[in-house]
């Protein structure tokens, strides 16, 4: 039954426009070129503006445009840093509610909890035994994170890109929507797929990256850094459940410069350009049109315009999250059903890998 389901799944996958593989942009694939899409998000609780514009919004579009997509709440990745079990359990449900409220539809895509599909860790160990230590130590994110922690990072933090590769390859994914900061990790995924195929015969597709159209959303208080939930400055990050008053306050305090005109010049006017990019994204307008409409407006007034646009965008999402969070049983059922569907796809792939490696 699982094999029949997988054959059926293989026949019904397709994907998107802004493809990127390695340093060169790839051509836009035709629908029949796309076999499977996978992406994941850590259970950080309620997403912020950067999560929404950088990933979730494009996920909704992708599931609507294509027949078969998997989205995972990657809780195994989250424990590479210390977690309170009670908070983690709630954060998983909060992220589930947020994804559903934003438009992720379990009938159009498979939404599941990573830790409930044991094949992820099984494949991860096999791939871990194929990658050299220096390769992981030279990844940018490992260097950056261990520098912050004074080289006290865990083995899990070092090897999480291999688990990320297993997440993707386990479903024989052909395309993966990623942000700019994940391109190097996707190169590792591609290399591991090729290494496995070279050793055991052609088995895994070599997945391609899809860069999201929205670049990193910057911190409202420091436009040189990306927006982050862990930012100690609470005015730097807009959560999608913030009240209208909180959103207005955060945009009022957003860092700009001493020039009052609204322009889009990311290299020289990072703060104002970040506001323009956010405004364009939530309003569904080109940056040029946003700048044109803002002619004659000073940045103080413009901050309120952007705040109003964000409030309008998030109002229905916020309301839906509040309703969904009141129904814990429903959220748990969504994850349970999604995890069962994911396992139905993962199990036969993992069994074939075990045969190729010599375990069966």
Swiss-Prot record:
Binding site for L-tryptophan: 167
One annotated Gene Ontology cellular component of this protein: mitochondrial matrix
Molecular function GO terms recorded: ATP binding; tryptophan-tRNA ligase activity
EC number(s) reported in the record: 6.1.1.2
TM stretches of this protein: none
Matching HAMAP family: Trp_tRNA_synth_B
Name of the protein: Tryptophan--tRNA ligase, mitochondrial
Gene: WARS2
């Amino acid at each position: 039954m699982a094999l029949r389901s997988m054959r059926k799944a293989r026949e019904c996958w397709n994907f998107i426009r802004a493809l990127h593989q390695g340093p060169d942009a790839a051509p836009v694939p035709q629908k029949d070129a796309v076999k499977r899409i996978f992406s994941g998000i850590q259970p950080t609780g309620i997403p912020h503006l950067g999560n929404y514009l950088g990933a979730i919004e494009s996920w909704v579009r992708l599931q609507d445009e294509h027949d078969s997509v998997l989205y995972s709440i990657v809780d195994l990745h989250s424990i590479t840093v210390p977690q309170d079990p009670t908070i983690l359990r709630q954060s998983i449900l909060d992220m589930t509610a947020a994804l559903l409220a934003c438009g992720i539809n379990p009938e159009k895509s498979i939404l599941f909890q990573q830790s409930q599909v044991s094949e992820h860790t099984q494949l991860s160990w096999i791939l871990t035994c194929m990658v050299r230590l220096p390769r992981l130590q030279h990844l940018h994110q490992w260097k950056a994170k261990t520098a912050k922690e004074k080289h006290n990072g865990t083995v899990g933090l070092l090897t999480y890109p291999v688990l990320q590769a297993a997440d993707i390859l386990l479903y024989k994914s052909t395309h993966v929507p990623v942000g700019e900061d994940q391109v190097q990790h996707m190169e590792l995924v591609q290399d591991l797929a090729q290494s496995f195929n070279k050793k055991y015969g052609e088995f895994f597709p070599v997945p391609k990256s899809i860069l999201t159209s929205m670049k990193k959303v910057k911190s409202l208080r420091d436009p040189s850094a990306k927006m982050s939930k862990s930012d100690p400055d609470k005015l730097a990050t807009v959560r999608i459940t913030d009240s209208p008053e909180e959103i207005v306050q955060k945009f009022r305090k957003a860092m700009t410069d001493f020039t009052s005109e609204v322009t889009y010049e990311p290299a020289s006017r990072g703060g104002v350009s970040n506001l323009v990019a956010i405004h364009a994204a939530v309003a569904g307008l080109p940056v040029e049109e946003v700048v044109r409409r803002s002619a004659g407006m000073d940045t103080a007034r413009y901050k309120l315009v952007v705040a109003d646009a964000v409030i309008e965008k998030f109002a229905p999402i916020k309301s839906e999250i509040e309703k969904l969070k009141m129904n814990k049983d429903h959220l748990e059922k969504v994850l349970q059903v999604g995890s069962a569907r994911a396992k139905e796809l993962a199990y036969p792939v993992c069994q074939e890998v075990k045969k190729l490696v010599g375990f069966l």
